[in-house]
Amino acid sequence: MKIVNIKGQIELLSGLHIGGGDDTMKIGGIDNGVIKDINTDKPYIPGSSLKGKMRSLLEWSCRVVGYGDGSPFTSKLLKEVPEVDKKDAETLLKLFGDKEGAYGITRISVGDCSLNNSSDGMVLSEAKYENVINRQKGTAEHPRQTERVPAGVKFDFDIRVKVLDEDSEEALVGMVKRGLDLVANDYLGGSGSRGYGRVRFHISE
């Protein structure tokens, strides 16, 4: 077995919102806060958020969405996939795991993404006001504040891929990089349709 590290930075091109639970309600406070490290009170990107977004987009890209009930793709559904798409589908199952167990252990591990040192001293929080437009009255209703990490802030990411003896390193690593490209062309976090979560990945190794 071999472990391949894919490291680099995530640069925010627009404000990012990944929600965190608020333990206390503050009068005049922000309605939707971002998730923050409990020790430093600084924002971070959960590895589960990045991994989940990659997997979702890769399932669309590999054309395996629609074979089940909306749950993640499994080997049980592989027989329904056209032969031309099976190679990608199998790589996807190896990378993210298969609850049926046919493809062994999950190969990918995505760590939480902490702030890059270049973000020291930068403003790490902004409040964006949003509302709903009443179509009949033409007025704004239900105003709320959403916290975002501003554009320009960078986070470090660290992805590790287990390559077993029977695996193709090129296929697994290629699938990871394909997933990162898909996220970069879509969005990360919430409210992507409003322009949130545009990111760029800088791979250093």
Explain the meaning of each model-derived region.
Residues 1-130, 136-205:
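RNA-binding basic/glycine-rich loop and surface signature characteristic of RAMP-family CRISPR effectors
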